[in-house]
Amino acid sequence: MPGLGRRAQWLCWWWGLLCSCGPPPLRPPLPVAAAAAGGQLLGAGGSPVRAEQPPPQSSSSGFLYRRLKTHEKREMQKEILSVLGLPHRPRPLHGLQQPQSPVLPQQQQSQQTAREEPPPGRLKSAPLFMLDLYNSLSKDDEEDGVSEGEGLEPESHGRASSSQLKQPSPGAAHSLNRKSLLAPGPGGSASPLTSAQDSAFLNDADMVMSFVNLVEYDKEFSPRQRHHKEFKFNLSQIPEGEAVTAAEFRVYKDCVVGSFKNQTFLISIYQVLQEHQHRDSDLFLLDTRVVWASEEGWLEFDITATSNLWVVTPQHNMGLQLSVVTRDGLHINPRAAGLVGRDGPYDKQPFMVAFFKVSEVHVRTTRSASSRRRQQSRNRSTQSQDVSRGSSASDYNSSELKTACKKHELYVSFQDLGWQDWIIAPKGYAANYCDGECSFPLNAHMNATNHAIVQTLVHLMNPEYVPKPCCAPTKLNAISVLYFDDNSNVILKKYRNMVVRACGCH
C-alpha cells in the first residue's frame, strides 16, 4: 500500500489476523428459504437448520446444526409458503400416508377387495402420472447440467405406467388415426411426454394440475342410456391469474379377453350441456379414439376448450360422459371394452390433467407486492450496514485473509419442516447463498460488474460515503415442486429464481 513501509504492512496484516481469529458467526443468522428474485436469500433447513460455515483457514465445508424454536419454525414456514404462492399449508384428505405396520393376510385381502384407497405410502394414478412429469423435468435439467432438486422415482408395484399404449401388432398401428397408444410399462417405461405436442405443453406451462374423478360409483349399464359412464372434476381451486393452455382426460384401458377380444372400439368423450331426469343428457362431442381390443394403457382425450369454459363459468361444469361403440354399431358397457372405472385398481383410476400459464397482469401485481416487502426488509438491514460503513483502506489488508465472494451450500428440507404429507417431490433442494468479500483488486473469478469495479475504486477514495460492492447472485435457476392441494388434487409448479447457481460482486 502506498505510504506504508514493509514493517507497517506486516503489522497491519498481523492486526487483521488477530481480529479475525474470534469464533465464526452462525451464517446465515436466521434460516431463510431460497434466493428470491431480488437477490434476497430466503433459505431454511427446517429443523435443524443447516448452513455452511467456511472455516477461516480451511477450504472444506461443514454444516452447523441448530434446533429451531417453535416461533422461528412457524415464521419460516409462513415465509416459504409465501414464496411458493400458497396462502396456507395444504391439508389434503388423501395425501402421502406414512407406511404403517404390516397387516394380516386376511386384512390385506379385504383391503384389496375394497380398493378405495391405495396402501399407505403408495400413490394413485394421478400422482404417479404427475411424478412422471416431475422426473421428466428433472431429467431435462440434469441433461442441461442443472440439478434443481432431488428426483423421486415412482414405485414399480404393478402399476400401468403413464407411458403410451402397447401396440398389438405392427400392422395394426396404421388404423389409429390419432396419437399412438401408451408405451411399455415400468420395466422399460418411457416418459408420458412422447410427442412433440405434449413436450410443448410442459415447456410452455408454469403449472400442471391433475384432478381426481368425483363420481363415487359407476352407474349400471342401461340399454336406453348410451352414454352412461360419467366423470366430474372440481376446478374451483385453480389459482387466480392462471389460464388453461391445454387439458386432457385420461382413462386406462385393459386388454379385452372376453367375447369382444377381436373387436375394434370407437371411444367417444362428451361434455354434458344439460342434465334431464327421464331422458339422456344433452351432450357435445369433444374427442374420439379408435382402439383394438388387445391394446392396453392410458387413453388421452383433448378437453382444452371445455376446461377453459369451466374455469370462466363454473356453473357450466356438469362433467363428462363416455361411450363405447363397436365396429358393428353396438353400444356396449365401457367395462366390456376394458376401460377402468372407480371400481378398478387405485393406480389405474381415470383423471384429468390441465396445463396452466400465469397471465402477465397477475405477474406484475404479484411482483410489485413482493418488491415492497423486500424493500422494507432491505431498509431494516441497511440501518445496521450504515454503522459499519466507515471503513478505511486498512480493511482491505484484513479482508484479503477472508473468503472471497463465492457460492456456499444451503439446503432447504421440506421434510424437516413437517411437510412430507403434502409435498410429493422433492424432499428438499439446494438453495445455496452468496457470501464473501469483494476486495480490491476484483479478480476475474469474482464475476464483478464494471459498476462494481468503479464502486470499489471510489470506496478506496471515500470509504465513509461509498460502501464496498456486495456479494450477490448472478445466476438463479428454477425448481419444480410436486404437491397436493386441499382437495387432494396434484399440482406440479415451476418456481423461478429459487436456486443460486453463481455469485459475483455487484
UniProtKB/Swiss-Prot annotation:
It comes from the Eukaryota. One of its GO terms (biological process) is positive regulation of SMAD protein signal transduction. Disulfide bonds join C405-C471, C434-C503, C438-C505. One of its GO terms (cellular component) is vesicle. Residues 96-112 have a biased composition (Low complexity). GO terms for molecular function: BMP receptor binding; cytokine activity; growth factor activity; protein heterodimerization activity. Residues 44-64, 87-125, 139-195, 366-397 are annotated as: Disordered. Transmembrane segments: none annotated. Glycans are attached at N234, N262, N379, N397, N447. Keywords: Chondrogenesis, Cleavage on pair of basic residues, Cytokine, Developmental protein, Differentiation, Disulfide bond, Glycoprotein, Growth factor, Osteogenesis, Secreted, Signal. Residues 140-153 have a biased composition (Acidic residues). PROSITE patterns: TGF_BETA_1, TGF_BETA_2. Residues 21-367 form a propeptide. Interacts with SOSTDC1. Interacts (when glycosylated) with type I receptor ACVR1; the interaction may induce HAMP expression. Interacts with type II receptor ACVR2B. Interacts with Hemojuvelin/HJV. Interacts with ERFE; the interaction inhibits BMP-induced transcription of HAMP. Interacts with BMPR1A/ALK3. Forms heterodimers with BMP2 in vitro; the heterodimer then binds to its receptor BMPR1A /ALK3 and may induce HAMP expression. This is Bone morphogenetic protein 6. It comes from Rattus norvegicus.
